[in-house]
């Protein structure tokens, strides 16, 4: 009837709460609330709980809130204020009364918030994509317990920019398998997940996932603005690209963790443990997304705990950028990029960069890796090149088997580069820095630091194939290797080992440490398909330049080749000291001619590709060269020896040591290498300076000692040949063969008792005492070549007018003209009563 009233419904403009008491709670229990596609569903009040309903038979029915392609708004408040619609922002904060306190939102028992798009059809029956909507949560606390939030996109339309938008003023907790998902399965872009909270805790398998599947769509980003973030018990944050069709180029979204203020700010701490992980992955043709962490502290602990960017097919993995003050990885935890593609056109694996909070080029305070399996790694299991690893920190510590590594001994592609820039690098306990390749070239290892300490560890760049070993380059102030520490570049087949270049302040090797660039292959490689034969690889070079001292105790520097040319060794330092079995060697066990067989116009043709001569050794010292119980050799078993040159302005001293360029080959055209020694003094004690040959010609030994050449009878200088022509020995020195032998000064000292007795005897004889007289020199300067007076003298003035006071009075430094004073004796010793008992 016309007289009846009508109910009119208009869009809500705002939700207002004016009562000083907290708003009443809202509970959805086992119900399903759904709005039409594209519309909004809002719950605004006090604490909000979405949970299951338990029936009398004990079964549970989960609660569901559904808004396909629309919006779900959950706003929990605990104080007066106003919420505006549709923005869900708070109203003007008049007199500070707008929502000073927020409430709690709880999702549990399998609850679902879903704003996923629905695939439809147009008038002609063609499929139409459905864009995902937005889940918006505003609260003081959020608990998601065994429940789910999702906003998926299908088809060619884009999802909302933020599929999940959560802002919590205090703490957000996801637990017991809970998940937040946004997935795009067409050409449309997936929505982002944005979570802002002072504390975020994910535990017991909780996850946040964005993904793209079967299309060209770009996955949504995961952006966490947090104070602290903790992942425990297998929890994860993931961005995935799962595009498998050849035309599918869908790219995974990025994972970004930063401070509460957003871009450019740093979280207080990010902690992952118990097999939890951050993952950016590509499982098809699409590219993986980027992983970026900006936090004052990053802690990873546990064997399967990882920050990982991986590519399993031709798609490339995303890069990892970690900006921190302090980073700690332990118990097998890793920061890792990898690719497993067998496609030769697959892109380079992603890079890993750990640096300071200011980004590119800045330095973290500390990066510490400990425990077997812990590490920063870029790896490939296929043909693609491994990515690079860069660490910039004031202090870098690796211990207990931890690694910084690119490539592996299984990959067929080239290894990546390792770059470390630090104030100090401390490596101990079998830790390693590696660039490896099974078939391709190994990458470069470069360290720039004020100090590098290595204790029972290794730095290695090597390949086990026809590839080239990578170079190792150190630019370090102080370098110390001890207890078997190794710096190595090697090849074990036909490739050339890389070079090792060290520009340092001081270098110390001790207790079996080693610097080596070597070819360890022993035989030529035969190709069974065409019968061609490849020659074994050659050793690389070692170049050491030290502004200060170089010392080596019971250690090795080697550029040896088992079946090809040995590499060269060059050492330049202020002083050089070798002791206790130190070996510097550039030996070769190869034949005089290194040959291989190649296929030319269908014919196998043998050709010479090199010689098997030993490498050369050059040592230049700015002061002295001292070798004790050590060896320096460029010997060859079947070819010619290398050259050895020792150049220093002061002294070369060899004690029970060996300098040898001898050869043992049976060919008459093998020759011992030449030896050149050119200091001011040469001192040989039980030493061997030899350039001998068996069938060929002995080498030339040139010793130029501008002041003296001194050797004992046990020392040998020999350039003879057993069957061939002896070499030459040329010794130029104004002074040679002093005394026939060298002997140390006596270490027997006069008896103080005997000297005291003589003093007593002198006193008894006539009362005369030994005296020391200080007399002026009338201001004359010291004569040329004479001794200079001590700048400060003291004496006990006994028996003089100074006795009894100022017992130890310093005499002024001797400078300029002496003052005039009367020369008087100073009694040097007070015998006292000692003489009365003689």
Pin down the residues of each PLM region.
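Extracellular and secretory-pathway beta-repeat/beta-biased strand scaffolds
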Residues: 1-838
């Amino acid at each position: 009837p016309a007289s009846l009233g009508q109910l009119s419904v208009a869009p809500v403009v705002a939700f207002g709460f004016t009562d000083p008491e907290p708003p009443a709670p809202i509970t959805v229990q086992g119900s399903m609330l759904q709005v039409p596609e594209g519309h909004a569903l809002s719950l605004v009040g006090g604490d909000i709980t979405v949970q299951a309903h338990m029936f009398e038979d004990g079964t549970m029915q989960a609660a569901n809130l559904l808004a396909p392609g629309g919006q779900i708004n959950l706003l929990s408040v605990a104080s007066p204020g106003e919420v505006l619609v549709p923005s869900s922002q708070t109203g003007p904060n008049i007199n500070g009364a707008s929502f000073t306190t927020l409430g709690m939102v709880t999702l549990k028992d399998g609850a679902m918030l879903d704003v996923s798009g629905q695939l439809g059809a147009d008038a002609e029956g063609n499929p139409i994509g459905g864009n995902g909507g937005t889940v918006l949560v505003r609260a003081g606390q959020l608990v998601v317990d065994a429940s789910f939030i999702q906003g998926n996109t299908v088809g060619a339309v884009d999802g909302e920019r933020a599929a999940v938008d959560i802002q919590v003023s205090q703490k957000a907790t996801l637990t017991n398998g809970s998940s937040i998902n946004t997935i795009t399965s067409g050409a449309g872009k997936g929505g982002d997940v944005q979570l802002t909270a002072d504390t975020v805790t994910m535990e017991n398998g909780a996850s946040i996932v964005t993904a793209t599947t079967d299309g060209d769509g770009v996955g949504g980003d995961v952006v966490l603005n947090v104070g602290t973030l903790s992942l425990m018990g297998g929890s994860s944050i993931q961005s995935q690209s799962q595009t498998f069709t050849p035309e599918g180029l869908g790219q995974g979204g990025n994972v970004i963790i930063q401070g509460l203020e957003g871009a450019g700010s740093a979280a207080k701490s990010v902690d992952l443990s118990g097999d939890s992980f951050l993952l950016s992955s590509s499982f098809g043709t699409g590219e993986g997304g980027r992983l970026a962490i900006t936090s004052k502290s990053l802690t990873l602990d546990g064997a399967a705990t990882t920050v990982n960017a991986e590519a399993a097919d031709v798609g490339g993995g995303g890069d990892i950028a970690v900006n921190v003050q302090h980073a700690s990885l332990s118990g097998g935890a890793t920061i890792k990029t990898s690719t497993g593609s067998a496609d030769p056109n697959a892109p380079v694996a992603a890079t890993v960069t750990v640096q300071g909070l200011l980004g590119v080029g800045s330095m973290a305070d500390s990066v510490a890796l400990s425990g077997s399996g812990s590490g920063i790694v870029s790896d490939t299991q296929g043909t693609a090149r491994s990515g690079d690893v860069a660490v910039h920190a004031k202090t870098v510590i690796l211990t207990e088997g931890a690694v910084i590594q690119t490539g592996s001994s299984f990959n067929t592609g080239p290894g990546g580069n390792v770059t470390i820039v630090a104030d100090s690098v401390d490596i101990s306990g079998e830790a390693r820095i590696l660039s490896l390749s099974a078939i391709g070239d190994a990458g470069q290892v470069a360290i720039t630091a004020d100090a590098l300490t290595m204790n029972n560890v290794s730095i290695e760049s090597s390949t086990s194939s026809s590839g080239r070993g990578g170079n190792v380059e150190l630019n370090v102030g102080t370098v110390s290797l001890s207890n078997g520490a190794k710096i190595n570049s090697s090849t074990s087949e036909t490739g050339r080992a890389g070079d090792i270049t060290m520009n340092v302040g001081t270098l110390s090797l001790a207790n079996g440490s080693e610097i080596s660039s070597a070819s360890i292959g022993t035989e030529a490689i035969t190709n069974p398909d065409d019968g061609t034969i490849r020659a074994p690889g050659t050793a690389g070079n070692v170049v050491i330049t030290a502004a200060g001292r170089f010392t080596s105790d019971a250690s090795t520097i080697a550029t040896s080749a088992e079946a090809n040319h040995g590499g060269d060794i060059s050492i330049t330092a202020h002083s050089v000291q070798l002791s206790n079995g130190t070996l510097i060697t550039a030996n070769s066990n190869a034949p005089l001619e290194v040959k291989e067989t190649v296929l030319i116009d269908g014919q196998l043709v043998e050709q010479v590709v090199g010689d098997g001569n030993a490498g050369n050794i050059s040592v230049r010292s700015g002061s002295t060269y001292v070798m004790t119980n050590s060896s320096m050799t460029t010997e060859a078993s079947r070819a010619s020896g290398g050259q050895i040159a020792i150049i220093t302005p002061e002294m070369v001293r060899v004690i029970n040591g060996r300098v040898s360029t001898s050869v043992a080959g049976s060919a008459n055209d093998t020759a011992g290498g030449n030896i050149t020694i050119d200091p001011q003094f040469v001192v040989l004690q039980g030493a061997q300076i030899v350039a001998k040959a068996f069938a060929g010609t002995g080498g030339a030994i040139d010793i130029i000692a501008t002041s003296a050449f001194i050797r004992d009878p046990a020392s040998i200088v020999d350039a003879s040949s057993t069957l061939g022509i002896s070499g030459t020995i040329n010794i130029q020195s104004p002074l040679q063969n002093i005394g026939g032998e060298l002997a140390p000064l006596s270490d027997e000292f006069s008896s103080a008792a005997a000297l005291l007795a003589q003093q007593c005897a002198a006193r008894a004889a006539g009362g005369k005492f030994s005296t020391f007289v200080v007399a002026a020199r009338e201001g004359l300067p010291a004569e040329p070549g004479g001794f200079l007076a001590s700048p400060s003298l003291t004496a006990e003035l006994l028996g003089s007018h100074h006795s009894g006071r100022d017992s130890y009075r310093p005499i002024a430094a001797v400078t300029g003209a002496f003052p005039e004073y009367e020369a008087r004796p100073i009694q040097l010793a007070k015998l006292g009563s000692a003489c009365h008992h003689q």
